[in-house]
Amino acid sequence: MTTAPRPDPRAFRERLLAREPLLGTFMKTPSAHNTEIIGGLGFDFVVLDEEHAPWDRGTLDMGLLAARAFGTAGIVRIARPDPTSILSVLDDGAIGIMAPHVDSAQKARDIVSWSHYQGGSRGLGIGRGGEYGARGADHVPFADKTTTVIAMIEDRKAIEAIDEIAAVPGVDCLFLGRGDLGLSLRNAKGAAPTLTEAVKIVSAAARKHDKPLAAVVPAMASDEAKWLIGLGVTAMMVLSDQGFMRQAAAAALSEFKSAYGRGEI
C-alpha cells in the first residue's frame, strides 16, 4: 500500500490563507517523540507550547526538527513576544509563531516586524530555518513568504481593539483564545460582552479583514467544534499530546474495569 505524499510544511501559510481545513494540536511535553507520533499520523501542524510548558531552546530545536522530518508544520507559541524569542524559534526552523495576548495594533505590528526581514527587523540567520544557506539570496523573500504569524486574542482589551489588530498587514490568522479571554471578561470592571459575544466580534473582524480563524476544541465531534466551524474557523486544534494520552489511558482503564467486572478475562 502506498501513502500519499505529505504537503511541504513550508506551504502551511499558503494553505492557511486559502482557508484549507487544517488539523493541529498543542505539544506540552518537551520531547521530540510525541511530535513524531502526531506528525506520523498526518496532523497538518503542531504548536510547541513554550508559554505553558517547560520547552527550552534545546528541546524546541529537537521538536521542530521532528515536525519537519514528518512533514508537519511546526509552530511555537512563544513565552515572551520579543524579538529575541521570535528570532530563535524561526532560526531553529519554526514555520511560524503563535503570539499570546496580542491586545493592541502596535503589539501586532511589532510581532510582524520581528518575524520578517523585508520591511521588518528580523536578524539574518542561516540555520535550519534558512536551510543552511541552500537557497542563497532567495532565502529572505522565501522566508518572508512562508513565515506564519498567528495573533492570540485573549483579553478584553483585545476585543476593544480587534478591528485595528485584524487590519495589521502580516497578521495571518486570529486565534480565539477563549480560556484566557473568558477570564479577562469575567474580571472586567463595568460592562463587558459575554464570551460568546466576544467570539462573534472576533469572527466578524476576521471576515471584514479577510483573516483566517483558529481555535482549540476538546473533540471534533462536539457541538462546540460545529459552532466554531460555522463562525469560520478553518485551523482547528484538538486537545494536546497530554490530553490525548489522558483520553487513551482513561479509556484503557475503563475497558479494564469493565472486562474484569463482567468476568470476561
What are these regions (language model features)?
Residues 1-265:
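Expand to "…catalyze enediolate/carbanion chemistry for C-C bond making/breaking, isomerization
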